[in-house]
Amino acid sequence: MRITVSGLPGSGTTTVSKLLAEYYELELISSGEIFRRIAREKEMSLAEFGAMAEKDPSIDLAIDKNQREVIHSHEKLILESRLAGHMAKEVPNVLKIWIKAPLPVRVKRILRREKSVSFDEELERTVEREKSEALRYMNYYNIDIDDLSIYDIVIDSEKWNQYQILDILKVAIDSLVGPE
């Protein structure tokens, strides 16, 4: 079973991916975690590292190449990243999930996780980060991140908590592959 989980910052992709990976005993690879780790190692904020990635395509291209290799080579995997669904487009039998939430909800969640600035500052950072990423995705791959048509499931994490989302996704997954 191969599953991709994508969404904008603060939408809950990492949380839901971890729950799915635990429930189905799947390996979880999170490109967002990799990106954040590299930013920390370079002692840069996500916005600074994103700006650097805008100027140096090799950063995104290396991470994305790795995603394509991973989704092709693993049978039991959850790949969590903004572009995971796009990276798996040509791989058969991959369930592609997009998790969405309104910007203010996502900013509040990011603040709970990072606790570094005010709401307005984080709102500005998040909008800047999303613009940076959208520009890079369009420039590198001609991907419009707002086009959700490639996803099998789009779910709103403002309406349901992570456990309710897990329950919804279990019904969808089990109907496709049968219960594990």
UniProtKB/Swiss-Prot annotation:
Q: Which residues form a coiled coil?
A: none
Pfam families tied to this protein:
Cytidylate_kin2
A Gene Ontology biological process noted in the UniProt record is: pyrimidine nucleotide metabolic process
Class of the enzyme per the UniProt entry, highest EC level? transferase
- Residues annotated to bind ATP: G7, L8, P9, G10, S11, G12, T13, T14, T15
Q: What Gene3D superfamilies does its record include?
A: P-loop containing nucleotide triphosphate hydrolases
Give the source's domain of life in one word: Archaea
- EC no. given is 2.7.4.25
Q: Which reaction does it catalyse?
A: CMP + ATP = CDP + ADP; dCMP + ATP = dCDP + ADP
- What keywords are assigned to this protein? ATP-binding, Cytoplasm, Kinase, Nucleotide-binding, Transferase
**Which GO-annotated molecular functions does the record name?**
ATP binding; CMP kinase activity; dCMP kinase activity
Instruction: List the InterPro entries.
Output: Cyt_kin_arch, Cytidylate_kinase_dom, P-loop_NTPase
Q: Is Cell inner membrane found in the keyword set?
A: no
Query: Which coarse location class applies to the principal site listed for this UniProt protein?
Result: cytoplasm
A single GO cellular-component term from the record reads:
cytoplasm
Compartments reported by the entry: Cytoplasm
Give the UniProt family note: Belongs to the cytidylate kinase family. Type 2 subfamily.
Q: Which HAMAP family match?
A: Cytidyl_kinase_type2
Please report the name of this protein according to its UniProt entry: Cytidylate kinase
Q: What is the lineage of its organism?
A: Archaea, Methanobacteriati, Methanobacteriota, Stenosarchaea group, Methanomicrobia
